[in-house]
């Protein structure tokens, strides 16, 4: 039963990743069909992100009322319905309207599943789950490209992805009693965490020492990851003078580094703690950014991108998994939603900000900003580690 339940969570993470890259993959064809401005894709993406941020912030209260199983079911149903709507949308206005439920569904299920896995499973599952998200994010454009290869049938691509999501909805509906049973079996762990006064239970969450630094670390991590993905090709073409097609392949290898790195990290967590992995990942990624900054032969840029991907790989899942350990299981339920909201905020707004600055100056500023983000993350992470050590020491003296 436990194995089947875990398989359902893994499938949910693949499903979570499937829609994330669809708009970018299909937009050149969608733009021509609708006669829309090139930048309209960014507007649609902001609406999706806004829905995701709102539902992430609400996830703590929703989890208490509905539980993880029902949240996952409802969220996947919203996502499936929105994707189906995309496949029939007659105008841009419809796409904008459907973007909101697409974002709302994604944010709730992301926060709910991350909290559940962080609370009830070991660190390797968190790394592998985010690796499976990468599988979904990779499969989405592949499915879409299959329909657009000869006939530009982007609507069929969205329709197919929606059918996959609806299939998951059916599975979740049939297994809803299993979710409730597993949550009841594992609820004693939450009760134990509520008995730990050292976690600052009586404090308002945002006033808890270390929370704001943690949230800023999530903001800069997702901003850095998304910025490299969005502007990496432009940097390689304009600064390193690579052909556009080759630059796209090198950026794909950056994402491959993240996905493969998370798979490997899952095994490493058996021997190495989350905090050491976060620290190591930040140092490796800083080395990657440094290679992009320096006036070295072009192939060093590929090594730099691979190091960025491999370095980024453990940071996000390990920070998520460390949340209950750092702040207590009771507080982590709401804090996980805050972390998701801040993460999506960073991924949504920091890349356009960097793009605007690059337009005013030069895209060669990319690795310098990424290095700055990494340095801040390292400072924030190490500072929170010291705060946690002080808190543990104080609780032991009481």
Q: Can you annotate each of these PLM segments?
A:
Residues 30-31, 62-63, 143-152, 236-237, ...:
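Interfacial helix-cap and linker-helix signal at transmembrane-aqueous boundaries
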Residues 326-363:
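A late C-terminal transmembrane helix in Major Facilitator Superfamily
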Residues 128-181:
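Helix-loop-helix hairpin linking two adjacent transmembrane segments in secondary transporters
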Residues 54-93:
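Conserved MFS/SLC helix-loop-helix module at the cytosolic interface between two early adjacent transmembrane helices
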Residues 23-24, 209-252, 256-259:
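Extracytoplasmic gate region of multi-pass secondary transporters
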Residues 55-68, 261-273, 358-359:
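Helix-to-loop junctions at the C-terminal end of transmembrane segments
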Residues 35, 67, 88-93, 241, ...:
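Helix-breaking motifs and short loop linkers at transmembrane-helix boundaries and internal kinks
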């Amino acid at each position: 039963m436990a194995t089947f339940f875990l398989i359902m969570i893994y499938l949910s993470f693949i499903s979570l990743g499937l829609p994330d890259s669809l708009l970018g993959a299909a937009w050149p064809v969608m733009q021509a069909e609708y006669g829309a401005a090139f930048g309209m894709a960014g507007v649609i993406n902001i609406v999706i992100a806004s829905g995701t941020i709102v539902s992430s912030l609400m996830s703590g209260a929703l989890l208490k009322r509905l539980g993880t199983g029902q949240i996952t079911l409802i969220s996947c149903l919203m996502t499936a319905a929105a994707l189906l709507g995309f496949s029939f949308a007659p105008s841009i206005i419809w796409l904008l309207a459907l973007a909101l439920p697409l974002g709302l569904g994604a944010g709730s299920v992301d926060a709910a599943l991350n909290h559940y896995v962080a609370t009830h499973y070991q660190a390797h599952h968190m790394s592998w789950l985010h690796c499976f998200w990468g599988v979904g994010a990779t499969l989405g454009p592949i499915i879409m490209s299959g329909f657009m290869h000869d006939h530009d049938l982007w609507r069929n691509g969205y329709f197919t992805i929606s059918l996959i999501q609806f299939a998951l909805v059916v599975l979740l509906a049939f297994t809803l009693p299993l979710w409730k049973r597993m949550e009841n079996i594992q609820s004693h762990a939450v009760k134990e965490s509520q008995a730990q006064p050292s976690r600052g239970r009586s404090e308002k969450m945002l006033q808890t020492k270390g929370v704001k630094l943690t949230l800023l670390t999530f903001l800069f991590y997702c901003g850095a990851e998304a910025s490299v993905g969005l502007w990496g090709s432009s940097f390689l073409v304009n600064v390193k003078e690579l052909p556009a097609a080759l630059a796209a392949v090198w950026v794909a290898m950056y994402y491959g580094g993240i996905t493969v790195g998370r798979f490997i990290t899952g095994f490493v967590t058996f021997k190495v703690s989350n905090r050491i992995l976060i620290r190591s990942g930040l140092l490796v990624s800083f080395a990657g950014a440094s290679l992009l900054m320096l006036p070295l032969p072009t192939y060093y840029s590929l090594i730099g991108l691979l190091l960025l991907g491999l370095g980024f790989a453990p940071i996000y899942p390990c920070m998520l998994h460390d949340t209950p350990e750092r702040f207590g299981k009771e507080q982590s339920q709401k804090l996980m939603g805050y972390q998701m909201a801040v993460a999506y905020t960073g991924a949504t707004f920091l890349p356009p900000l960097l793009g605007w600055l690059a337009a005013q100056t030069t895209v060669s500023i990319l690795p310098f900003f990424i290095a700055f983000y990494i340095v801040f993350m390292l400072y924030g992470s190490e500072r929170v580690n010291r705060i946690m050590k002080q808190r543990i020491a104080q609780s032991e003296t009481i």
